[in-house]
């Protein structure tokens, strides 16, 4: 069973905006002739890397909800120009919307088990919820209607 990470998407207002950020980074990489992979740099290197690489994803918390995920394809520890240890979380450049679930803010990243992870939004009734404008979806959820 794969292990996942969960992290706040700081400064991101919606899944659509996150997808836009990833698309911009991929366009820049394409222009520079670099590999098409989405990289997020973090200060701490996950110790359970083999479990994460066995099908794990990085789940993104956007505006207080677990809202999307990206599949982790590599974990690359490195030292920055000041000699400080960092880590590149390399992900497939495909943002997958998940069934929204409330999540309080926290710092850094955390491990996230498979049984705690929300399901992907598929081609079902949940997909119509994903198609709603996010403010409407949040309001309906706050009212207990979703």
Language-model segment annotations:
Residues 1-23:
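Short, extreme N-terminal leader segments that mark the start of a protein/domain
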Residues 1-3, 34, 53-54, 82-84, ...:
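A generic structural signal for short, non-catalytic loop/turn and secondary-structure boundary residues
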Residues 4-9, 58-60, 69-71, 88-90, ...:
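Ordered hydrophobic segments in well-structured contexts
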Residues 8, 18, 35, 39, ...:
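Positively charged, polar, low-complexity stretches
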Residues 23-24, 76:
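Short, solvent-exposed amphipathic alpha-helical segments in soluble enzyme
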Residues 26-69:
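Short, well-structured hydrophobic secondary-structure segments
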Residues 71-118:
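Aromatic- and Lys/Arg-enriched surface recognition patch
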Residues 108-113, 119-146:
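Well-ordered alpha/beta subsegment
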